[in-house]
Amino acid sequence: MTRTAGLLLFVAAASLQSTATAQQTSPYVAAQRAESLRLAGRPWHAAETLLAAAAREPRLNATFVVEGAKAELYARRYDRARSLLVGQPWLEDYADGAALAVLAEAEGRLGLATQAAAHYAAARARVRGSRAALLAVREGLAWEAAGARDSAAAAYGAARAAGLPAIDAWVRLRQARVTRDTAVAFRLLADLPAPAAREAASARAQALLSAGDSVAALEALAQAGRSLDLARLALAHGDSSRARDALYGLMARAPETDDAAAAVGVALAALPPRTPPERVALARAMKGHGGAADARLEVERALRQGDSSAATLVLAGELFTTAGRYRDAERAYRSAAADPVLGALAIYRRARVLVRLGDAGASEALSGFAQSFPSDTAAPTALYMLGDMLGDRGDWAGAARWFGELIARYPADLRASLARFRLAAQALRDGLRDSAAALFRAEVVAGGPQRTTARFWLGKLTLLAGDTAGARATWLALVREDSIGYYGLRARREVDLPPLRIAAAPLPGPSPAVATWFGRVDTLLLAGLDTAAQAEVRAVLARAAQQDIDALLAWGDGLAARGFGPAAVRLGWQAALKSPNDSRVLRIIFPWPNRRAVEAEAAEFGVDPLLLVAIVRQESVFDAQALSPAGARGLAQLLPGTAALTARGLDVTFYPEWITVPDLNLHLGAAHLQELLQRFGGRVDAAAAAYNAGAAPVKRWLERPGADDPDEFIELIPYQETRGYVRAVLRNRELYHALYVAPTN
């Protein structure tokens, strides 16, 4: 649940009376339909329903307009929400300030902080008690965004006076940040409970800044480790030297953080890099946040300024490789090869670049690395690449030599496992079933990472040899020992067992302590304090190992329902460590918090809802804001280009900022999945592979001998990530069926 969702839950209660007394007109029916869609987790559909009704009705009553604005807020179309409400003659009198609160939220999202604060204040004046307190917190946040610290402090004080005991520590923290009287501010910060206490040092610095003591504020920010805030404040007061040290120190120390990403913008705008170390620090931060091209330019400038350190050369090699400049990458890695610390990495990466170049020296470089650095974690990969390269050329005798050395030296390594399967696949193509079986048995004996895969294929080979009873015994043993894994479920079908059914006992209700905690999180979300709610969730995750099984299950169930899917699943895995045979744990590891929305979108496009939820679980773990390193967004993890293309095909209005609206993302994801299923003749395995890797490579893979057999098709997917993804999606579909579909006669 987000800040906007929290506000609209709050506003909904205020709107009930007005809605109940509205006339039973066509717009009213549309509003009811929209509310039903919203409650089913389909806010975009709700907004579209009301938009269509509005186009048919020249005169709309206040209830319909407010419901439309709320729907637009849920759909993150904030400008539309605002335009529906601004200037309405009934705005200030509607449902005890409910319309004012919706307008204020839209304005806040649009960056109109002063207008938002004024409208929150007007809404607050029309109510009492906890509703007034929640609106006061939102008003304070808006005043803070507008830079009006005194008004923000007054609003937070009013919120505390109206009574929000569940979140008082967090409101105290906000109030202290904007209080000019440091004595009062420091009293507010005294004895804060965790996790709010972790923010006290930063709040103390902000209080000093509110009081005008910038020198003390700078020191407090330094002590709190808030380098970005320190740099901004130092810049504002003309201390560019301190700001520079803070910015570039942050980017060098923690380039992957959000603060480092923000530091890039500050540095480029006010303090561009001057020295090679600054350029390298900037490049590292750029690289981690989608700026590889700019990072490469900064590293090249550092090299031209005389930076010849191995660390910079290795970074340059990485960036050149990303850009396809393989010759430049090879030279950079070669120059770093003599370094005592990074030399091995440089030699290995140079060898990989030579492979990409098709250089005749690639084999010698890989084998030389594997022989010179046998204890390096990359040595098995080097040997695998040698075998893989020769195998792709059809030289299976040469491939077997290197794969054999890999298996002998690193028998339990993942690459050894992959080598066994490459050799086994070739043996099967050559009709050497006994050789393939020996390789599969070796994987089992070694306890390799693909041992369940090997056992499944041993069953298939046993069946091909005519030993039906032996094959059945192998598969039944696999069913017992890997009951919820992909190959255990696959073996289940081979022996004609009924579909897996997991009749889990009801999940426990929350204990008083857990219920109190959820009350605090819900109140934080209603108040618009999303970051504080996230801090509370992180605190629960940090102490999960100390909790009992029922607490973990209750927390996981509640968090999944509130949109914290990844956190819920993490708690589920923690519960599995404590009680591995408790079937209730699976409902936390494989939750279905948005079931109605998934089923509705699947039905609209004629796809299996179990397949769609299996993909969502694998792609985003039900995190509507999920962002992948490749730029995929939302529940169904769509790339912006894919989302836009799919929307165009559906004649759906789409803007990039809407991509994480939950049901719009699901809508486009379901449409994309249906298109892939149609393209590949209904083959779920191929469609799942294409969802992960794209349609073009899957088309090539389907043209290979043996691809008609789904088992062989999956095993021969050359991308390890995609191979694992397809298995996981198919396993997920079986488990969601086992957990959530009632048995039928």
Where are the model-predicted features located?
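Residue-level detector of the short coil/turn that links helix A to helix B
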Residues: G41-R42, R76, G111, G147, ...
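Hydrophobic/aromatic side-chain positions at a characteristic register within alpha-helices
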Residues: R38-L39, L73, G108, E144, ...
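Short solvent-exposed coil/turn linkers within tandem alpha-helical repeat scaffolds
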Residues: A54-A62, Q88-G97, A123-L135, Y156-A169, ...
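"A position-specific structural signal for the A-helix of alpha-solenoid helical repeats
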Residues: Q32, E67, V102, R138, ...
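Residue-level recognition of tetratricopeptide repeat
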Residues: E35, K70, E105, L141, ...
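N-terminal leader/linker segments that initiate helical-solenoid repeat arrays
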Residues: A20-K70, Y74-R76, S83, A98, ...
